[in-house]
Structures are given as structure tokens and as C-alpha cells.
Amino acid sequence: MARKYELRERAENIAATRARIVEATVALHEQLGPARTTISAIAGRANVQRLTVYRHFPDERSLFQACSAHWTSRHPRPDAAAWELIGDPRERLRAALLEIYTFFRRTEGMTGHVLRDLHESPALREVAEPLVQYWLHVREVLDEGWQAHGRQRTLLRAAVGHAIAFETWHSLTGREGLSDAAAAAAMVELVGAVEG
């Protein structure tokens, strides 16, 4: 009976150590970004040895996957399926941008750092691929129903893509000082103006 208890306790300790490493990684990625986070910094923050980090996560990809899964579970992306139920494309865009910009506000540190660091790490790009696909799907959902054709359709699609970009939100609410709601309204007007 003592052996089973010891095995269970050991498994719990391993899980707790892994969780500390993941939490430390998430915190450092939010603060510094994935490219500037070192294994030494993760180990220090998690209060473990570097070798312990490597035992749990033998490569960048496995560490990024664990970090991404943990962070995403705490910060779910807006539900694009709900927007598909809104028939009017302008109202759909307005509702979506309000949710998207609120999401960006809550996740600004991590989102900004990950986007900045994507070009530096093939492992990060691989782990972020579902995120890239999500944003492509969002653009498809928000592109539906507008009455634009030909060149205007191309411009409208670009305007929708611009409206949902983190960098657009960051510029409008940071440098330009708009609220999330005012930034969303401005982007709805921009896309509407492209439609004509």
C-alpha cells in the first residue's frame, strides 16, 4: 500500500512541477515574449533547475505547445460562429470588432509579443498555426454579405483584414487614444466606405 501512495505522490509532484514551469513560461512570454524568454529565466521563476525544464520539455515546440494550451484555456478567443448568425454585414462587423478589441485589450501583452516573435522561431510559427487559421476564418465570416464586386471587393476584403488586425487595434487605441468602442466604430465606417 505504501508503494502506491509513493507513486501517486511522485506523480502529483511531477505534475505540480510541470504546472509551475508552464505558469513561469506563460508569465515570461507575456512580459518579455517567447524569443526573449530563456530556459534559465523559466527555471528561476519556476524555482527548478534548467535540467528539470528540459526533462519536462525537451524542445521549444513542446514548451510552446504547453504554454499555448494553458494560456488559451484561460483566454478563449471570441466565438466567430456567433457572428455568423448576424445577417447584416455591418452589424456583424460591429459586434465582432467589439469582441475582438476587448479580447486584444485583455491579451495585449501576450498577443503583441507572440506576433512580434513569430518570424524568429519556426517552432513558434508551427504552434501558432491554429491561431493563424482562426484569424483567416474570422476574416471569411466578416467578409460575407457585403455588396462589393471586382476591385472594390478586393479592397473591402483588405479593409476587413485590416480592421481585425491586432496592430490596427493597437495603433487606434494606443497612439491615437481611441476607446475600443470608438476604434471599432471607426473601422466599421472605413469598411462601409469601401463598400460604397
What does each model-identified segment do?
Residues 57, 116-120, 163:
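Short helix-capping/turn signature of helix-turn-helix
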Residues 38, 112-114:
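Short, hydrophobic secondary-structure boundary micro-motifs
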Residues 39, 68-76:
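Short, basic, alpha-helical segments at the C-terminal edge of helix-turn-helix-like DNA-binding modules
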Residues 144-190:
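Hydrophobic/aromatic-rich alpha-helical bundle segments in the mid-to-C-terminal region
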Residues 29, 64-71:
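Alpha-helical DNA-contacting segments of helix-turn-helix folds
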Residues 66, 77-109, 132:
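Hydrophobic alpha-helical connector segments
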Residues 56-57, 186:
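Residues in the recognition helix of alpha-helical DNA-binding motifs
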Residues 1-51, 56, 62:
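Basic, helix-initiating cap at the start of DNA-binding domains
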